[in-house]
């Protein structure tokens, strides 16, 4: 079947979403056009509003509608702890554990094959955040994947000898898993059982 230019454009736009292939994008596009035009318009408005109104927190770099996200704006949080995560969904996951420290959000993990080196994921900004803060412990909560482990190792080597306690989230998080998919109890156990990196 040959689609009109506007429908093809909609299908291709939907394909940028993770896990959405050609067939799924076609089904979504046709469902919106045939059965739920008002829902499609709401989706378009919400997407436009979010793209225009959501930026990054100037301190931790998570997604935020304000200059400071709620976690960075909260004066009751523990300024001695800094939790380093790969993305904004990881902040949400760690928050579910009751963690009360500060965050730094990388832009993913080191992946030389994809052209993602230290600068691309924000390592210089992390160094500046640590230099300007009063942190005594840095918790490396990157995903327990090969790339996440490599990123944690790189950061640990970079921060060694700076008088900081460096720890890595521990057991409870499955190897090869993603933090955003781990339940809160498991992640709380992993944070409580974190271990120093030597």
From Swiss-Prot:
GO terms for molecular function: DNA binding; zinc ion binding. GO terms for biological process: double-strand break repair; recombinational repair. Gene3D superfamilies: 3.40.1360.10, 6.10.250.240, RecR Domain 1. PROSITE patterns: RECR (PS01300), TOPRIM (PS50880). Keywords: DNA damage, DNA recombination, DNA repair, Metal-binding, Zinc, Zinc-finger. Residues 80-174 form the Toprim domain. InterPro entries: DNA_Rcmb_RecR, Rcmb_RecR, Rcmb_RecR_Znf, TOPRIM_dom, TOPRIM_RecR. It comes from the Bacteria. Coiled coil: none annotated. The keyword Metal-binding applies. It holds the Pfam family Toprim_4. A zinc finger (C4-type) spans 57-72. The keyword Metal-binding applies. HAMAP family: RecR (MF_00017). May play a role in DNA repair. It seems to be involved in an RecBC-independent recombinational process of DNA repair. It may act with RecF and RecO. Belongs to the RecR family. This is Recombination protein RecR. It comes from Pseudomonas aeruginosa (strain ATCC 15692 / DSM 22644 / CIP 104116 / JCM 14847 / LMG 12228 / 1C / PRS 101 / PAO1). The gene is recR.
């Amino acid at each position: 079947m040959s689609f009109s230019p506007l429908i093809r454009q909609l299908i291709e736009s939907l394909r940028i979403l993770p896990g959405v292939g050609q067939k799924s994008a076609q089904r979504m596009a046709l469902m919106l056009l045939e059965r739920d035009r008002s829902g499609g318009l709401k989706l378009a408005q919400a997407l436009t509003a979010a793209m225009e109104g959501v930026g990054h927190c100037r301190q931790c770099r998570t997604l935020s509608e304000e200059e400071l996200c709620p976690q960075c704006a909260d004066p009751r949080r523990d300024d001695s702890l800094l939790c380093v995560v790969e993305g904004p969904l990881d902040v949400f996951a760690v928050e579910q554990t009751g963690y009360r420290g500060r965050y730094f959000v990388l832009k993913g993990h080191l992946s030389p094959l994809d052209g993602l080196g230290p600068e691309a994921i924000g390592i210089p900004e992390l160094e500046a955040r640590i230099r300007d803060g009063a942190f005594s412990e840095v918790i490396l909560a990157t995903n327990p994947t090969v790339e996440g482990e490599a990123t944690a190792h790189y950061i640990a080597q970079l921060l060694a000898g700076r008088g900081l306690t460096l720890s890595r989230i521990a057991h409870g998080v499955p190897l090869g898993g993603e933090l955003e998919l781990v339940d809160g109890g498991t992640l709380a156990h992993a944070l409580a059982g974190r271990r120093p990196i030597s």
